[in-house]
Design a protein with these regions (language model features):
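Mixed-charge, glycine-accented linear interaction segment located at domain edges/termini
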Residues: 105-193
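Short, acidic/charged, Gly/Pro-enriched secondary-structure junctions
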Residues: 77-105
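Short acidic, glycine-rich loop/turn motifs
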Residues: 13-17, 94-100, 175
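Solvent-exposed edge beta-strands and adjacent loop segments
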Residues: 1-71, 108-124
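Beta-strand elements of well-folded, non-transmembrane domains
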Residues: 69-73, 96-100, 131-135
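Beta-strand secondary-structure signal
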Residues: 64-68, 91-93, 126-130
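Generic N-terminal simple sequence motifs
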Residues: 34, 98, 178-179
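A short, compositionally biased
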Residues: 4-9, 85-90, 166
């Protein structure tokens, strides 16, 4: 078993608002192409005469996940693209090689695609998921200091995948270990079982 969330990952997608716990598992991405890039939010500073800092506030960070899939004979791509645009919003779960470790969860993303070709790699599509705030998504929920529900664009979650009928997967999510607090399973409700 691993100590960190590295190695060959599994990527799962689901349209936002799906009625069933059915996720598609994507083909194995190109080696070392899967990554999440955070962009730190802008910092706003109020200064007084003489340059002293009165107050400082940092805006929320933004997140993008990207991976490359080979265009293979007989293997369909996960998204229909029109000049790099993918219609609809998708949930994204990236499970590390060791499923006991936390993986990436984005509860609402827009998806873009960049199609490319080289003689070294052949045909590839780079898919980029830009994370949005997933209002009402219990997997993305946390509670702030005011005891209010807050929905995060990016969360660490332990992801358990079970293969079901028709090549679909059912995913269960847990919070990761936090100090002495053990992982807690997150209960999702779907409108159709």
């Amino acid at each position: 078993m691993s100590v960190t969330s590295w190695g060959k990952c599994s990527i799962f997608i689901q349209p936002v608002g799906s009625a069933k716990n059915e996720w598609d598992k994507l083909d194995t991405p190109k080696e070392d192409s899967t990554q999440v890039t955070p962009t730190k939010g802008d910092t706003m500073t109020q200064t007084e005469e003489g340059g002293g800092t009165v107050d400082r506030k940092t805006k929320k960070s933004t997140y993008e996940a990207a991976y490359q899939l080979f265009i293979k004979k007989g293997v369909s791509q996960p998204f229909k693209t029109i000049d790099g645009v993918v219609e609809g919003n998708y949930r994204l779960a990236i499970q590390p090689e060791d499923p006991e470790l936390p993986g990436v969860y984005m509860g609402n993303t827009t998806v873009g695609a960049e199609e490319a070709f080289t003689t070294a790699d052949g045909a590839l599509i780079t898919y980029t998921h830009s994370a949005l705030i997933p209002d009402g998504d219990v997997v993305a929920k946390t509670i702030n200091k005011k005891n209010e529900d807050v929905y995060c664009a990016y969360r660490w979650r332990v992801i358990k995948a079970t293969k079901g009928a028709g090549g679909k997967y059912a995913l269960k999510f847990s919070t990761p270990q936090a100090g002495e607090t053990p992982p807690t399973e997150i209960e999702e409700t779907y409108t159709s079982v």
